[in-house]
Amino acid sequence: YYRKKLRTGKGLAVHCNHKVVAVYVFIMLACVLFTVWTLYTGKIEICYGENEFTVQAEGWQDYTVKYDAIDRIACEENMFRDTNTIRTNGFGNLKYSMGHFRDEIHADYIRYTHNDCDTYVVMEVEGSTVILNGADDAQTREIYNNIRERMEK
């Protein structure tokens, strides 16, 4: 059949429904936009109260810590360079890591961090490890100093 059509010069006509093509293009663009949006969205803010602070996380649940529940606090650098960190429950993208994690250094811990900053505030809170940071080293050290000052009151 195909060879006959080619010999006569007619070839095969391809019919496409332009509405179907438009729907497929729309769905594909929506998927691409959603993927890009998810890779770069989120926000982490720390709100300090008199007795506690709250990590407000856009894209994941907020986390509140009472100052008197903090057993130990430290500011550490480059903790996750050579570790095999696994997110066990949470949210993460190219900018943020939030939720429950596991690695060989801290075992199971809670983390609300910016991925571009290698300085971290590490706290032991009632037997659990909580790790925070800011967008850069200066913000992280400010978080550390703010929490430390409020713990001493």
Predicted regions and their residues:
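Non-transmembrane, membrane-adjacent beta-strand/coil modules in membrane-associated proteins
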Residues: 57-65, 72-126
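Alpha-helical transmembrane spans
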Residues: 1-43
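Terminal and domain-flanking low-complexity segments
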Residues: 1-5, 9-11, 114-153
